[in-house]
A protein has these predicted regions:
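N-terminal loops that bind phosphate or other acidic moieties
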Residues: 1-131, 135-195
Length: 195
């Protein structure tokens, strides 16, 4: 019998690879003759780069940028041929802050722009930005501001997400996700007024 472990990460506690290894270790302890394989997976949040780094042509690059509170940091991204993959959680991730009403009011997507610019300079023609696991609710305003006049005419920019919520409203991004990022009910109402 063959067993495949492909478990997504548990936010803030264990990576996909760690969970796969734990599951397979338990299975092999009970059934040592089984054939097992581990394949890390991700849903668009934490771990996207770890999963794609297994690709033969994956090249890890780094970019100097700022996190969601404006603190300097260096983050990895991947080049797969002329496609770059950027994991938002590495730049503006919820795990980078202690969430509170104060952090949600200061948190910005600004730092993503520097990573996109770095990927363009590295030759990327397609840039995939995984959108999960963030600690921001600025609707991408900081990201757009940081790009400024960057020429994107020869670049395809793709947002990778496992949700389909609209920008704002009853089922909008702020209504559904801002509370987990520290927003109060009043802040969520204000975020929903950004149209």
């Amino acid at each position: 019998m063959k067993i495949l472990a492909a478990i997504d990460s548990f936010k803030g506690s264990a990576t996909s690879e760690q969970l796969n290894d734990a599951a397979l270790s338990g299975i092999l302890a009970a059934y040592p003759d089984l054939q097992v394989q581990s394949i890390p997976i991700a849903d668009g949040g934490e771990g996207v780069l770890d999963v794609l780094a297994y690709q033969e042509n994956a090249i890890t690059k780094t970019s100097l940028t700022t996190d969601l509170l404006g603190r300097k940091l260096e983050v990895p991204y991947l080049l797969l041929g002329d496609t770059a993959v950027i994991e938002s959680a590495k730049v503006i991730g919820i795990d980078l802050v202690d969430v509170s009403p104060e952090t949600i009011s200061r948190a910005t997507t600004y730092g993503l722009g520097a990573v996109v610019q770095s990927a363009i300079q590295a030759g990327a023609k397609t840039i995939i930005v995984s959108l999960g696991g963030t600690g921001t609710s600025d609707g991408g305003q900081g990201f757009l501001k940081s790009l400024g006049t960057t020429d994107l005419s020869d670049v395809t920019l793709i947002g990778a997400s496992d949700v389909t919520n609209p920008y704002y409203g009853e089922n909008g991004a702020a209504t559904i996700f801002a509370a987990q990022k520290g927003a109060t009910a009043d802040q969520i109402k204000q975020l929903n007024q950004r149209d």
